[in-house]
Regions:
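Short beta-strand segments enriched in hydrophobic/aromatic residues
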Residues: 13, 78, 204, 215, ...
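Short capping/connector residues at structural and topological boundaries
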Residues: 22, 68, 101-102, 144, ...
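Linear, non-domain "peripheral" regions
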Residues: 1-111
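Short N-terminal helix-initiation segments at or just after the protein's N-terminus
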Residues: 11-21, 140-150, 198
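Hydrophobic/aromatic-rich core segments of domains that either
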Residues: 163-246
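Secondary-structure boundary elements
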Residues: 78-82, 87-159, 167, 232, ...
Length: 267
């Protein structure tokens, strides 16, 4: 499947911002299950790409002139291998056993993981865990903040895809299974207009397997990956800091849709 993506993020500030810096992980890269056909960023000024410690493509946008708005755009086309269930990588999975403030498992999460996985440490066990988390934590926009940790979201029994993913990571790591946060996009036939998405990957049998708690999907057939990390802070598409500006309004618009692949026949 070939997906076309358009993602625009706009920031408006009530006062002039003296300076700002934005960390952008908005560029996908080729892997076993996705191939980038075309991609470009639309930014206020040219920025050189670099690679972060997790292998993500990173752009650092620095604006040192006064401004009251920023518009960040990304668009392109990517082919997705809908049949591939897992991805192999040469990088060690060991770092993804480490917990962070957002993914630390408390006694409740450790007990939940043990209850639903018992002594099993296979894909079936993690699929059961994924379904159990989805039933326990009701998808509720606005129930949590961007810095809400897994334990707090789990205790509140509500959250969004970020919280579902953090809770899954906390549980998997408590079982000794390397797991990582994934940011990207998901195409759904229900609507082409979606927000950016988040899901988890766990290291099993020397490969990374996907677990989308929010949508109860264990096969990434319509997922497009942007970045990975230990948690949201490592992999979120846009994260920044600024001096001045006062109150901020942020609006994100995402469009994801399939695109016909036209084959040219030679005569």
């Amino acid at each position: 499947m070939r997906l076309s993506i358009s993602h625009e993020t706009t920031y408006h500030y009530e006062d002039q911002v003296r300076a700002s810096i934005q960390y952008l992980r908005l560029t996908p890269h080729d892997s076993e299950r996705q191939r980038v056909i075309s991609w470009q960023l639309d930014l206020p000024r040219p920025v050189r790409a670099q690679v972060d410690p997790f292998g993500n493509i990173l752009h650092v946008l620095t604006l040192d002139e006064p401004h009251d708005a920023i518009i960040i755009g990304a668009r392109g086309q990517v082919d997705i291998d809908e049949l591939r269930e897992a991805e192999h990588e040469s990088q060690s999975a060991f770092p993804f056993l480490r917990s962070t403030r957002l993914t630390e498992a408390d006694e409740a999460l450790r007990g939940f993981a043990g209850q639903h996985c018992h002594q099993r440490r296979d894909r079936t066990a993690l699929i059961d865990l994924m379904h159990a988390l989805n039933q326990t934590m009701v998808y509720t926009p606005g129930a949590t903040e961007v810095d809400t940790c897994a334990a707090k979201a789990f205790a509140g029994r509500a959250g969004v895809c970020q919280d579902h993913t953090h809770a899954f990571l906390a549980c998997a790591r408590s079982l000794g299974i390397p797991a990582r946060y994934v940011s990207g996009y998901l195409y759904s036939e229900d609507t082409a207009h979606l927000a950016s998405h988040a899901w988890a990957e766990a290291w099993l049998d020397d490969a990374w397997y996907s677990f989308d708690v929010t949508n109860q999907l264990a096969r990434p057939e319509r997922h497009l990956k942007l970045a990975v990390g230990l948690d949201y802070l490592d992999a979120c598409p846009v994260r920044g800091m600024r001096r001045g500006g006062g109150h901020e309004q942020m609006h994100a618009k995402v469009f994801v849709a399939p695109t016909p692949v036209i084959s040219v026949q030679q005569q």
